[in-house]
Amino acid sequence: MLYYLFDYLEKLQLPGARLFHYVSFRSAVAIVLALLLATVIGNRIIERLRKAQIGETIRDLGLEGQLSKKGTPTMGGLIIIISILIPTLLLARLDNVYILLMIVTTVLLGSLGFLDDYIKVFRKKKEGLHGRYKIIGQVGLGFIIGIVLYMNPAVVIKENSEVLRDGQVERVHFNKQEVKSTKTTIPFVKNNNFDYADILPLEGKTKVLFGWILFVCVAVVVVTFISNCANLTDGLDGLATGSSAIIGVVLAIFAYVSSHIEMASYLNIMFIPGAEELTIFAFAFVGATIGFLWYNAYPAQVFMGDTGSLTLGGIIAVFALIIRKEMLLPILCFVFIIEGLSVMIQVFYFKLTKRRTGEGRRIFKMTPLHHHFQKPGNAGIDAWLQKPMQAIPESKITVRFWLVGIIMAAITIATLKMR
């Protein structure tokens, strides 16, 4: 909104009004504003949640310090959502299709998570919203994102190709024409590009249609999987919040370089016109998560609940799809994914061994993976992996997972220059 106001003021030749035309300036304002909003309104929202007795119910899993969390306010994801949306609405261009998709993602998954938390708190159902309804919401969002990216005429890219001399890359050339494309960025392949339409040996319109059908299916899987993995990661104070902030920084960098033709040329990635506005959203996302971490760090004064975790995961997934970096998520979202996979592997192995031997066995002492490190090796749990033998304090597990996230974020950026 402020963009349009200052655009009008610039026409009146108001000194300094042109600043709002610079994405870098608006991004800087966005992160500061989001950070201030999260810290200032966060305290007030926490007090209201506490007075309304909107507290977390805790199951006794035998974890150190677990029962002390009972009654801690939940639904704190509202702080994150508000702190993302207000800077975005004020500073970003609202005629940009990518910004509109991110706003829809934030509101839709925020509402889905809020409904889940509401059922847990007020209807006293620990399982919350039935899993099938969560999946329907996530699949529906992924389908919407895929279809909009397919059908909206503003969603285009400029394809890149290498110009070689003596077998060496001399420069990267961008085609003048902006095209609809099912290409995505992936390291270790020619031009760092991979086209979904090339999977099957098809030609013409059939090939194009197949590429978009596959892209929509990938969008559905990515949104559903990453949002659920983020939800499972939110089990230790500050873990999901800090990990999301790290991922958000990388996504902000990707959005900026993808919309800057010289930087895109240097990194040999596709140029995406209009993606620069996503930088503002990403900085608001980072500011909101860091601000929320002020209250969510150990010992947490508030939990984000599904209101926050589903939203964070969905935002990361949709953002990556828009800037065509979804194939980098296994590296960038490594912490989220190993948390989710640990649960899937545990359930699969338990059911498999129970069917074969009549007694279910475990690989990990407890899942998601962060709980495995909270359990000592002599806890009497029959699990294939018993190390570490000593329980690790919650705060140390969180910091170590953050460090892993930072390392994987650096590797993600580095892959763009690998040939």
From Swiss-Prot:
What is this enzyme's class at the first EC digit?
A: transferase
Q: Which domain of life is it from?
A: Bacteria
Keywords attached to this entry? Cell cycle, Cell division, Cell inner membrane, Cell membrane, Cell shape, Cell wall biogenesis/degradation, Magnesium, Membrane, Metal-binding, Peptidoglycan synthesis, Transferase, Transmembrane, Transmembrane helix
Q: How does it sit in the membrane?
A: Multi-pass membrane protein
Q: MF terms per GO, please?
A: metal ion binding; phospho-N-acetylmuramoyl-pentapeptide-transferase activity; UDP-N-acetylmuramoyl-L-alanyl-D-glutamyl-meso-2,6-diaminopimelyl-D-alanyl-D-alanine:undecaprenyl-phosphate transferase activity
Organism whose genome encodes this protein: Porphyromonas gingivalis (strain ATCC BAA-308 / W83)
Q: Which family does it belong to?
A: Belongs to the glycosyltransferase 4 family. MraY subfamily.
Pathway(s) it belongs to: Cell wall biogenesis; peptidoglycan biosynthesis
Localization per record? Cell inner membrane
Q: What does this protein do?
A: Catalyzes the initial step of the lipid cycle reactions in the biosynthesis of the cell wall peptidoglycan: transfers peptidoglycan precursor phospho-MurNAc-pentapeptide from UDP-MurNAc-pentapeptide onto the lipid carrier undecaprenyl phosphate, yielding undecaprenyl-pyrophosphoryl-MurNAc-pentapeptide, known as lipid I.
Transmembrane helix as UniProt keyword? yes
- Give me the segments passing through the membrane: 22-42, 72-92, 99-119, 135-155, 208-228, 238-258, 278-298, 303-323, 328-348, 396-416
Required cofactor names: Mg(2+)
EC identifiers of the protein: 2.7.8.13
Q: Which GO terms describe its cellular component?
A: plasma membrane
Task: Kindly state a single biological-process term from the GO annotations of this entry.
Answer: cell wall organization
What name does UniProt use for this protein?
Answer: Phospho-N-acetylmuramoyl-pentapeptide-transferase
**Which segments of the protein form a coiled coil according to its record?**
none
